[in-house]
Amino acid sequence: MAIRVLTTRGELPGSGLRRLAGAAGLVSWHGTGRPAPEDLAALAPGSTAVLALGNDPVDAALLDAAGPSLRVVALASMGFDNVDRAAAAERGVVVTHTPGVLAETTADLTFALILAARRRLGAAAASLARGDWGLFRMDDYLGLDVHGATLGLVGYGQIGRAVARRAQGFGMRVLHHDPYAAETDALSTPVDLETLLAEADIVSLHVPLTAETRHLVSHRELAAMKPTATLVSTSRGGVVDEEALLTAIRAGTLHSAGLDVFEREPMGAELSPLAAEPYVVTLPHIGSATERTRAAMVDLAVDNILDVLRDRPARTPLPGTASAYERPVSGSRS
């Protein structure tokens, strides 16, 4: 049987697609923006594998459109909320993602957002671009210090720990809350979420988007934070209730925010109201966006596909889906 791989983008960084093309026939979506589920489903029949970006929809309809030949869905992302994991498990389809390779790069961007939000860099740069710098004033664009501040990390996996390491250079006190983190280290002190929210000057979110974490930060959590605090998120947009955050920012009950992710992505011309707030720094989901890291993500996704198609265990299966890798991948699904 011919090996056919559907990629949700026709062009990806690095040489991963060229490697994949040497082992399989490729069919790709070449539109603009985010592909609609029906666009991908139309290309899916007969696919052996799907290589998808982190916010491209991989639903039951796509899996069914691919048919019984489908063995693996490989995400070129760490997040996996775009995949119907239950549907994949029911159909015996392996699902993989790309943890590890993007942790340090995303931690860099997290710290960039911390600095930009606390020091009001976005508003200051916009003022300069408008030609407003006509007079030096001691009270222009006063921000808040990062050095010596208390940093609270919600989620203490690879990215959270990488952020904690960077915080040491700023002399920060670091707290973290993660009920699933078994390991402890000298970088951070584990606390409950209530303590973290009450004591942190900066709260940074590093959790996947699941039913449990959707709107993890909403009105109650924002009210528990200091009015001088900053909220930063490089995880997934749905973890933060954007309406609640906008209310807190406009009311002045929260100092600032730095966001790389949003509930609706991509936005196009219809921006989130948060993008216009002078105390909010917004970016278009670029946490892993360096040449080397994005290429490494594609390479790992391709490696996962090739491993499964060669009847080997995938390198980075999704958490909680190990049983999918124990089944023989040759033959069709029942």
Per-range role (PLM):
Residues M1-T96, A198, S218:
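An N-terminal-biased, well-structured beta-alpha scaffold segment characteristic
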Residues A2, H147-T150, H219, T228:
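Phosphate-coordination loops involved in phosphoryl transfer and adenosine-cofactor binding
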Residues V58-A61, L175, P179-P273:
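Rossmann-like adenosine-cofactor binding region
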Residues V95, T228-S334:
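Rossmann-like dinucleotide-binding domain for NAD(H)/NADP(H)
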Residues P99-T150, A162-R165, A314-P317:
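Phosphate-binding beta-alpha-beta segment of Rossmann-like dinucleotide-binding domains, i.e.
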Residues Y156-G157:
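Glycine-rich Rossmann-fold phosphate-binding loop(s) that bind the pyrophosphate
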Residues A66-R71, R91-V93, M172, P227-A229, ...:
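A short helix->loop->beta-strand "cap" motif at the edges of active sites that frequently abuts
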Residues A24, V93, S188, Y279-V281:
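Short, conserved active-site loop motifs that form the nucleotide-linked donor/cofactor pocket
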